[in-house]
């Protein structure tokens, strides 16, 4: 006997991972140079030098490098993370409100489990990372989707209001956004905070913001508002996977706002959820790396150049694209209503694009441009050919 829901998840992979595996298979069959794999948000920019330096130093000097830390993370590491938040954003979180985790996915799963009570509802703002629904349901909650404004892919506040009810525990806010690359402005965050403040009073309990921030440092010439400064009942789920190009190392943290309702006990609930899920003692080596590299920032030049090349090339051809101010994704309007059919036609030209249906945005495809500049240049003729095929069918 086994759990049928888990079987369903295991037997049908996420559309992103499935496309990624398909790309590897195609590369083996026809040559990697003939496959333009834009499926997975896997950073192509190397980790900063400080990461390598820290690893060498730790390997030569730290006798407990591979040992256990405290369940919630090494004290010195949590102190370093807390001080970084205080320096950068002016929020005095303190080490006792920091929980080190195995990346943003673990942070989300722990937080959702900590907040869920009697089939709580969690609002996700479209477009959204598809695994949100998986994580919410695994925590015992129910996902409720709030729509987006089609003009700029920011949250539609009227549908957000309608989505919030008496059982709402939290709203997940992801900015810079995956898949659109949109960065929510200060004005947008203030409006979301206003809605949640009113709804919290209406229903007599706090409605939290879960700030999913793996792309916080990947913003081009715009400011990413720090949500704790706008809304007290905020829990930040952070990952170093994108900012330090460490996706395979699985390291991040949860930070509870000191202004959150019953913050200390909320943190204890997070500790309890981490224990129940087996997410204790995040990878100790990379905890210590983070302590030494906590102030490091990514080199955005490569991503900015990729964005500009891809956005300018596709819009010149005639594609309708959402200009991204952050992350490393370009959201492109499919050339037919059925984005899955469009992505299938793109496949025939070696272009691997993720349909937007799973992101809650039908009629779009996501392009992950965290690839080599050369690959983007070589892919442009394929995008041109794809566009020409649709244009010729109109004649």
Please tell me what each predicted stretch does:
Residues 38, 64-65, 80-83:
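Glycine-rich loop-to-alpha-helix module at the N-terminal edge of alpha/beta enzyme cores
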